[in-house]
Amino acid sequence: MDQALPSLVSVADRQHSRTLTEMRQYGFRLCPVPDGRPPYVYTIGLSLYSQHPELVVSAPVAVGLPMLRQAVWALQRGVRLAPGPLYRLWRADTTPIQFAPVRAGLTRALSLACAVLHTRYFAALQLLYTDAAGHWPWDPTCDPAISQAQRRWCAVPRPPHLDEYL
């Protein structure tokens, strides 16, 4: 039993060290949580290096990683992401996304961020997206799996004004 403990600690130490290295090099790290219910991806380092809330998206890792990567690249180009407006971060013909504040206290579930930032409470925004048919999570016709997954981190905001694209 005692022999297993050092290996667990060393795994956590390596993960923490890798996170700090990536944050210093790139200004952030993307952390996938494939076994989350639902799966999700979040950032660590935006609050330190960009003075911007951390980001989280409830999506399978293969979908969530590129979504957050594009959002971070937009930040690095000077776009400030905020709750409310619609954004098209990829191309003009892509589905818009929106951000909403993560509910108070839920950031404590982002354990690696808590360890690196030395706090369980920090500002974070959830990236919200539509289902394949273009329905937002608050739309009753939205795919239930997409709608439910996105209710994990924030109170579903009111529908955006469709002419507010950035």
Q: What do these predicted ranges mean?
A:
Residues 1-37, 47-51, 56-166:
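Acidic, proline/glycine-rich low-complexity IDRs
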Residues 38-42:
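Short amphipathic beta-strand starts and helix->beta connectors
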